[in-house]
């Protein structure tokens, strides 16, 4: 099963809207998927004592990562970087087993012209350090507000085709690594 990580905890985020479209693509391809939305992280995880002892309410999130065959991270760009909650989530996971030899795919979006290039590259460095297998096909969505319609759906057919191609390729990548 692939885990789709919604890389922000911002309510009503464009990241969540894009993740919903990726869910539809995975479902259409009949690829088993679970969604891990960082907006649903338990509040007690943000206590300084959580580094030493993880709250029991965090275990389902940590277990989802450990049991996943691959991770598809959807990240926005906040201040030229990865959202703090996404980095914190990564830091809270078990080391090294959470990402060791795990396939990881990245989709980035931003209001600006670079489409989250910086945070995706930062995440590639982090996951590479953690010995993950980085899927080389990344999709960047610059000026995201121009790419979504009033209902939050991606209105650009070429972009949807790129996302579908990314998902198809990543699903094959995960299967090859599992084999």
Feature map (PLM): residue ranges:
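Mobile beta-alpha loop/short-helix "lid" or hinge segments that flank ligand
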Residues: 34-45, 95-97, 130-150
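Short, glycine-/small-residue-rich phosphate/pyrophosphate-handling segment
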Residues: 103-143, 158
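A generic structural signal for short beta-strands and their flanking turns/coil linkers
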Residues: 29-31, 100-102, 137
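Short amphipathic alpha-helical patches
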Residues: 49, 85-88, 112-117, 130-133, ...
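Glycine-rich NAD(P)-binding loop of Rossmann-like domains
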Residues: 99-101, 150-155
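N-terminal beta1-alpha1-beta2 submodule of the flavodoxin-like/Rossmannoid cofactor-binding fold
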Residues: 1-95, 153-179
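Short, flexible coil/turn micro-motifs enriched in small/turn-prone residues
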Residues: 2, 7, 79, 103, ...
